[in-house]
Amino acid sequence: MKKVFMLVVAGLCVIATLAALKGEDEGMGFNEVSALDYCDAQVRRTLVSLADSAGGMDYTMMPRNILKDESQWNLRKTTRDEWCSGFWPGVLWYDYEYTGDESIRQEAERFTESLKYLSQSPIYDHDLGFLIMTSFGNAYRLTGKEEYKQVILSAADSLATLFRPNVGTLLSWPRNIEMFGGHNTIMDNMINLEMLYWAAKHGGNPYLADMATTHAEKTMKWHFRDDFSSYHVAVYDTLTGEFLRGVTHQGYADNSLWARGQAWAIYGYTMVYRETRDSRFLDFAQKVTDVYLERLPDDYVPYWDFDDPSIPDAPKDASAACVVASALLELQSYLPSDVARKYRSAAIKMLTSLSSEKYACGESKPAFLMHSVGHKPAGSEIDASIIYADYYFIEALIRLKNLL
């Protein structure tokens, strides 16, 4: 009965916040507070749905996706090869940051704690940065607890073992060296450099920051075409470090522009500039942003790959829009007012579309957003609600709220 009551309350909150957002869409202007209220209501719906009949919860099971024709989260066990496990704790930490609700903080702590063992396990791949910084990174940022700091430092040391000095980048997928025919570095890996920079600033080996910068430099040199669009995967000779080729894994083709890959580039180089204050990275962040913005459809939410020949019938990828919106709200803070205004306006247009009835789940699902694409070539998570879309959506809203 209690679970049913909580679902009813959460549902009423969703209705109220969606009504507010709809009014804003019709002329009142985007309001990040209404969007955050909506996220909070959806978080509470998810928490209710995760509880068993006795009110208990398995904190090792994380929301991953809600497929197109489904209405509830599919859960995944927290394991070292489940790269999305940190995003749900991260969503809870951002919701706690917004609401100040101690019950949300307690749930965030419990889900975060279930990931601790990953910092002490043999490294699986580059995704350890996603797993730890979204969960423990936000936990430490909001609480300052020493135990969280130690987990991040340990994980950073583990991630650093993937760095290959002869190549100059981290090896993204050790298990796929043979498949790609060499040392593989994927664009997603740019996000994981943040953990190396963080550790270097918080008592870890200063060389971790040098390692991250070297990776960013090598990626900047070889991972992009002349127009600053990115390959998904850069393949290097394992022995000599020579760049061999750029290919795709999750995009449409080797020479196409996979939307989320470019989103990782925008977010990653913005972060690298924050950590280094090296103007080369600020300039490059703008270049990779501009090629993305120039190719967006009218609603500012990209198709999953900008070069899919089935456009406009190709699926959209809301997750890419969320990553970019969050990145742009940081990037604009480093730029002169005229350029900053351009990027800030683009981010708000993205968030406005994402908050509309076209993309927001509303009462139909407890996720924030619909219409993301995970891995289309593999037929996986196409036109789905995906947890990392929700993570970067709420992060972008928090950044906008703190900006205004």
How would you label these PLM feature ranges?
Residues 1-27:
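Bacterial Sec-dependent N-terminal signal peptides
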Residues 22-404:
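Glycan-recognition and catalytic cores of secretory/periplasmic carbohydrate-active enzymes
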